[in-house]
Amino acid sequence: MAKPAVFLDRDGVINVDHGYVHDEHDFQFIEGVFEATAALQRMGYLLVLVTNQSGIARGKFSEERFISLTQWMDWNFADNGVEFDGIYYCPHHAEHGIGQYKEECDCRKPKPGMFLSARDFLNIDMANSVMVGDKAEDMMAAEAAGVGTKILVRTGKPITEQGEALATVVLDSIRDVPHYLLRVKK
């Protein structure tokens, strides 16, 4: 039986977006992220990370460095009782990529490739799933993948009119997501 998921962008949702974050010393968790994700898991949602990482494509850091940071991040969540069900990332950029990463792909948001891969692998009920992101591209990818609820948070990039128009709701941060979902899913 398909299960609903909460899809989470990384930079601006899980951590403060300092621009091309690739080192543990620059990785600052958003306040309340561990409590919020633990609550979402208790509510029965799968947790799936979906993140564009054009810093890899641009040569700002290696894919290995990203994977190492992601493992460190994942361990921090595990230490706080939270397990990700899936971690998906796009290392490509069609314009600014170099070498093998200069590619027009289906995984880079606003395209829905990461969402569809997660749906197929984890048997996700997309209509009852949620996207939490900080940009219009997050909302566009979620819409294209059939995600039912799209939440834009103010902890990342400035909210645009386009992002706000595509979102179901705009909240201050991920820490507000469980309370919102409990209110609307009653």
From Swiss-Prot:
Its main location: cytoplasm. Keywords: Carbohydrate metabolism, Cytoplasm, Hydrolase, Lipopolysaccharide biosynthesis, Magnesium, Metal-binding, Zinc. Also catalyzes the dephosphorylation of D-glycero-alpha-D-manno-heptose-1,7-bisphosphate in vitro. The gene is gmhB. It comes from Vibrio cholerae serotype O1 (strain ATCC 39315 / El Tor Inaba N16961). NCBIfam families: GmhB_yaeD, HAD-SF-IIIA, Histidinol-ppas, PRK08942.1. Belongs to the GmhB family. Zn(2+) binds at residues 90, 92, 105, 107. Substrate binds at residues 9-11, 17-20, 51-54, 108-109, 135. One of its GO terms (cellular component) is cytoplasm. The record marks 108 as: Contributes to substrate recognition. The record marks 51, 109 as: Stabilizes the phosphoryl group. InterPro entries: HAD-like_sf, HAD-SF_hydro_IIIA, HAD_sf, Heptose_bisP_phosphatase, Histidinol-phos. GO terms for molecular function: D-glycero-beta-D-manno-heptose 1,7-bisphosphate 7-phosphatase activity; magnesium ion binding; zinc ion binding. Pathway: Nucleotide-sugar biosynthesis; ADP-L-glycero-beta-D-manno-heptose biosynthesis; ADP-L-glycero-beta-D-manno-heptose from D-glycero-beta-D-manno-heptose 7-phosphate: step 2/4; Bacterial outer membrane biogenesis; LPS core biosynthesis. This is D-glycero-beta-D-manno-heptose-1,7-bisphosphate 7-phosphatase.
